[in-house]
Amino acid sequence: MAAMAPGGGGSGSGVNPFLSDSDEDDDEVAATEDRRAGLRLGAGVGLDPGSAGSLSPQDPMALGSSARPGLAVEMSAAPAALGGSGETPARLSIDAIAAQLLRDQYLLTALELHTELLESGRELPRLRDYFSNPGNFERQSGTPPGMGAPGIPGASIVGGAGGREPSTTSGGGQLNRAGSISTLDSLDFARYSDDGNRETDERVAVLEFELRKAKETIQALRANLTKAAEHEVPLQERKNYKSSPEIQEPIKPLEKRALNFLVNEFLLKNNYKLTSITFSDENDDQDFELWDDVGLNIPKPPDLLQLYRDFGNHQVTGKDLVDVASGVDEDELEALTPILGNVPPTLDTPLPIENTLLVQKLEDKISLLNNEKWSLMEQIRRLESEMDILKAEHFATPAVGDSVQPSLVWSSQKDSEDNRQSPAVNSSDQEKTKDVHLEIPDAADSFIPKENSSGSFPRKEREELPPSSVSNKTTLHFDQPNRKLSPAFHQALLSFCRMSADSRLGSEVSRIADSEKSVMLMLGRCLPHIVPNVLLAKREELIPLILCTACLHPEPKERDQLLHILFNLIKRPDDEQRQMILTGCVAFARHVGPTRVEAELLPQCWEQINHKYPERRLLVAESCGALAPYLPKEIRSSLVLSMLQQMLMEDKADLVREAVIKSLGIIMGYIDDPDKYQQGFELLLSALGDPSERVVSATHQVFLPAYAAWTTELGNLQSHLIPTLLNKIEKLLREGEHGLDEHKLHMYLSALQSLIPSLFALVLQNAPFSSKAKLHGEVPHIEVTRFPRPMSPLQDVSTIIGSREQLAVLLQLYDYQLEHEGTTGWESLLWVVNQLLPQLIEIVGKINVTSTACVHEFSRFFWRLCRTFGKIFTNTKVKPQFQEILRLSEENIDSSAGNGVLTKATVPIYATGVLTCYIQEEDRKLLVGFLEDVMTLLSLSHAPLDSLKASFVELGANPAYHELLLTVLWYGVVHTSALVRCTAARMFELLVKGVNETLVAQRVVPALITLSSDPEISVRIATIPAFGTIMETVIQRELLERVKMQLASFLEDPQYQDQHSLHTEVIRTFGRVGPNAEPRFRDEFVIPHLHKLALVNNLQIVDSKKLDIATHLFEAYSALSCCFISEDLMVNHFLPGLRCLRTDMEHLSPEHEVILSSMIKECEQKVENKTVQEPPGSMSIAASLVSEDTKTKFLNKMGQLTTSGAMLANVFQRKK
């Protein structure tokens, strides 16, 4: 007899040792153990409820002696009741007697015992707790053990023992509480109290408690009625249904009420009010105002419109079907054959001989098919075992795809053979893969065969089968998407599932046992590792055991609990632990099939979608992708897609969203519902715009290539996806006239760049020669540098095509077609040439050429496009379109041409994105010639040089092009036009910063010195910024001296004395390079010459020139004031120069004069501090701090120069 606490269940009180962060409390566990101990009678003396010495309903004398518990409870008065021995038995505790009475439902006896104990002042907690809980009197109670069954005398005997009979002896009905009976929890003890002040309050509390209990009673009763209504079918309908099983199953009362409610709701929503009133009158037994009238604990379904719309998304089957190998019981055939053979030839049985022969033929065919089936299943098992071994030795994550595909192939082959050869089996659908179904009564029967189960094998046949055949009695089929992805692409996509099979534990997890023998072997392998490692850090050792049990257990509730344990095994699983759990989930899914994966595994994911720990949510996101191949296709494209979309939009953890993106990519590899295309596109845009760089990177590596593959199959790559992205870029450029959103531009353009491999694969697959691409003979070689390095395996063209060998054959035919046969009839390539390229070139012309980031992005895009499509395509299709637009010719040079296409971003993008794709000699010559022509045309037309500068900046970032750029500049140095020479001199400034000092010494400085002696003064002036940049970046003493000498000649040569533009350029250069130049050059050359220029400017009589020089001097002094300046230099040059400048600004710019006065005062204070505190030539720490403070103040105030003079007058005043 099972020991059960009153009102409790027998299986729900156990403590699960596998849960790491369960909600069980230590107090609850202790209480459970106390209850268990209290259920044993005489626990202290070894008595058991089932022993002869226990108090049980079968012992009337014992009950009679215990009917008055107020007396001394001695068992010596009834020796016969204790087995008839003359020995005095042990004394029983009152608590043990009370427990036995409650367990056997002797409630009246127990109540009298409780009353007498209260009267004697010895209240028993067990009885007090039991009778104070009204719930104990409202549940349905069955017949107690040993009671109510015919032939057991205990019932009548106890019934006559003082009238203390259990209420259930008269039937198994409810023990309802009556309103007139006061239970102990509702007794008004205030009536018996001397203190009457609290009587009202206590009565109110008791009444509130009574009301709450009454509501709970009503709710429980209605729940019972709801369940009863679900299963209640009128007798006549049941008879009709049994006699005619082809008729639809009759409607249940609960279903009828639910449908009535939904129909009435639909009528009201659509203004069919009169119809609704009539409908309500015809169903007057139902309240249409409240759903609870239908069923209290039944959730309300969506409205009829939603149900109708959602109907097409689900495949409705009448019965639970599972793909199993069909068989016929040999015993039945043997019993059937003689009966058929003995049928006499009558009119009612025509052609008996033919029927008998037909049956015999069918028997023979079934026997042959069964033999063939078992041999194939044995072969499948052997091959899978070999694959598991190879996978454990050689592969890690990618091995999962390998292990799935062969089994699917064998299953589909075997099924197709069964469909062709066996007329006795039924096909459940007419899709591409026809599955053979055998109907079974319960899901558990498909895993634990029973003798009488219709889905189990006959006893005789099971005994004769080889051991492996039993374990493979079910052939599972997973929904294969109607997709055309190459196996290589599929394999690369599945490689993003985070699973592990390259370790001992990983191989155990991926090799789930599916028979009793295998379970034993698994336990033998795993237990030695589990026993010492039950700590939290090693909980993953339990995964094989949990999975095996969950796979084979017949009870759905237990399986659900085990899978719950699996997902909650580790509180915050790390990366390795998550991989192990995922590997186990995939292995579980492969063994149980898509139906159980959907019903058992997916809910575990859904429960943790909003878990507080990101590691748990990460596990959910990763499991959605890992389980995608094993789910029904309707679930893949609906529930799983919605889960991932919710996590992408709502989850705040970057790692979780990254995993979501990878899982979305895997889903996109399996989805085949065209209606989900737009939803996928919206998810793509959301992922590309994610603020996390990790998420964006995962989008380009996984999601975008997988989505592009699906888009290609739907025919939307060239018709929707790429054009939509291009239109978004154009819209950005139109709206960005006053400020371009460069982040969004980068987002869309990078997406286009990631689509280039998919576009090229589409061009190859739809080429006129695609049917000729057969692998035979020697496969041509593909150069390593033929394609740009892909961001991920999914962007590798060979992966998209299927294999590197197939790609090599296609490339050979592709080049031949372009070179000799042209593009006639090649629609996919003509779209690239006639629509994509012109639109791209038009977009390029709208880009702001001064935006370095935009120029760089488009340059990289064209570079990848040209490298992917090949050299022949670039030379024959891309370059001619650019050249047609640019039209580099000196014949039509005029000033208006400066506003043309040469000044736009088309020039740098063509130079850096197209002409640099290939680096053979002829390609380099073409690039040099193009840059020389652009430099010449821009110079001669007096156009802005921004496009040329952008080209030099982009190319100068790569040292491989430094020599080439110097060649272009030398062409300008020796050009006959002074305008071109002047442009070349200015370009040297851009090139010097990135060129190594050897090239500067050998190529740059000689060219600049040549230009510095040019006959044209404008050319000489144009060299000054380049000389200044050399002073700023070069550290070789010899080079610095040469530059210093050249600059000194500009400043000290009498021929330049009146050259206002030269002085302006020198001062501007000094202000730019002075703070970063070598200190000795700054102290000995820059500051003294600025002092001289300030003195000369005092003598200038032209106010416009004086103001121009003064303004540039002010900017130069402002920049140099932040540098360390020695005391001598401060006194002899810096302060005198500032005073000269202030003299000029007093009349020309009073607002500048205020700031200069403050600067002079600060500098004088620094000099005074040095003189007082430190010997000459040194500087104290305090003075240094004052100097730094002055610099900070000055820089903060410099930003206010553009404000009014009145405000500037107060900028540097002391605070009072």
Curated annotation (Swiss-Prot):
Compositionally biased tracts (Low complexity): 142-154
Coiled coil residues, start to end: 197-231, 358-397
Organism: Mus musculus (Mouse)
Keyword vocabulary terms for this entry: Acetylation, Coiled coil, Endosome, Golgi apparatus, Lipid transport, Phosphoprotein, Repeat, Transport
Protein's job: Regulates intracellular cholesterol distribution from recycling endosomes to the trans-Golgi network through interactions with RAB11 and OSBP. Functions in membrane tethering and promotes OSBP-mediated cholesterol transfer between RAB11-bound recycling endosomes and OSBP-bound Golgi-like membranes.
Gene Ontology terms describing biological process: intracellular cholesterol transport
Keyword Transport: yes
Subcellular location per the Swiss-Prot or TrEMBL entry: Recycling endosome; Golgi apparatus, trans-Golgi network
Composition skew (Acidic residues), residue ranges: 21-31
Location of the LisH domain: 255-287
SUPFAM superfamilies linked to this entry: ARM repeat
Subunit details: Interacts with RAB11A (VIA-GTP form). Interacts with RAB11B. Interacts (via the third HEAT repeat) with OSBP (via C-terminus). Found in a complex composed of RELCH, OSBP1 and RAB11A.
Sites of N-acetylalanine modification: 2
Highest taxon, organism lineage: Eukaryota
Record's keyword annotation contains Transport: yes
Region (Disordered): 1-67, 133-179, 409-473
Protein name: RAB11-binding protein RELCH
HEAT repeats: from-to residues: 601-639, 640-679, 1004-1042
Phosphoserine: residues carrying this PTM: 20, 22, 54, 56, 180, 182, 186, 385, 453, 792, 1149
Basic and acidic residues: compositionally biased ranges: 429-440
Modified residues (Phosphothreonine): 32, 183
One cellular component term from this protein's GO annotations in UniProt: recycling endosome
PANTHER family recorded: RAB11-BINDING PROTEIN RELCH
InterPro entries named among the record's database cross-references: ARM-like (IPR011989), ARM-type_fold (IPR016024), HEAT_type_2 (IPR021133), LisH (IPR006594), RELCH (IPR040362)
